[in-house]
């Protein structure tokens, strides 16, 4: 098949490859075309750096996919930039780059204008005109990025779970605005938030300046639950959902909340706690379900069932199917989940390759059966 490789200069190279080619082979082909030694090449696809020993198929790279080529320069190096939110950015630089260049690279990656960036290394603020070498910044050093906001400032909000959120605010922001920013970041409705500073609960209509809250102050966030509590719901896929509930909520209400979060109709939900299936008309209190209890969610499918599909990479996908589904339908469901076109899928069960026109029932595939997915790569076309 053909794939494309795009360089940082914007040039695009076309390569003839097979799905079974490993990344080392691909780098050798790039060397043949462009003369760039493999050890100076870094290949990126879907935001991931590709490892030499893995194959194109491992990364689900298909015909006409585009890889990005970044040069790893001798005399060049990688450094890391850590933001106050804890995010780490990786930059390709040279010792001779000045701080202004580095800020431009950060702008390219993160969209933050250089004049709002302050870079700190070994406790010192770095000056634009100086170079990385001047500050003895070497490969894999970590710089710290602090934002310089016009009239603005950063404050921190600490939750009861110990998590710290960073907010960009101005002194003239009122507490209501701050709660809205917290909602944007964390999804907690303002009317469930209580903010505490210096032991005082903050009132919505007052501003940060009214409370003498200055840059890098820390507020404490307490959740105001109306006689309420949090419980957890664990699905068969291992995902855990957090719900805000009250002891007086009945099981039907809980299923409605799960539908709001996950889109699963209540009549397809079975909830289990302490080994018992919960009945719709009963309340959480009836079952002695208390704060931070974990319920288990099992899907009840109309004539339906769950099956598993295992890929060559070892990943297992869960599908909701019915015995009357034909193999073509199943491949479409896999495409919806994984993006793999049906014509590149071969499904194997009990050692047999499954034919598109036949149904799951034809092959006696029952609930919780495991199919194996093999990719069919069209040779080198």
Swiss-Prot record:
CDD domains: Ubl_ubiquitin. It is found in: Cytoplasm; Nucleus. There is a cross-link at residue 76 (Glycyl lysine isopeptide (Gly-Lys) (interchain with K-? in acceptor proteins)). There is a cross-link at residue 48 (Glycyl lysine isopeptide (Lys-Gly) (interchain with G-Cter in ubiquitin)). GO terms for biological process: modification-dependent protein catabolic process; protein ubiquitination. Residues 381 form a propeptide. Coiled coil: none annotated. Keywords: Cytoplasm, Isopeptide bond, Nucleus, Repeat, Ubl conjugation. Residues 1-76, 77-152, 153-228, 229-304, 305-380 form the Ubiquitin-like domain. GO terms for cellular component: cytoplasm; nucleus. Ubiquitin exists either covalently attached to another protein, or free (unanchored). When covalently bound, it is conjugated to target proteins via an isopeptide bond either as a monomer (monoubiquitin), a polymer linked via different Lys residues of the ubiquitin (polyubiquitin chains) or a linear polymer linked via the initiator Met of the ubiquitin (linear polyubiquitin chains). Polyubiquitin chains, when attached to a target protein, have different functions depending on the Lys residue of the ubiquitin that is linked: Lys-48-linked is involved in protein degradation via the proteasome. This is Polyubiquitin-A. It comes from Dictyostelium discoideum (Social amoeba). The gene is ubqA.
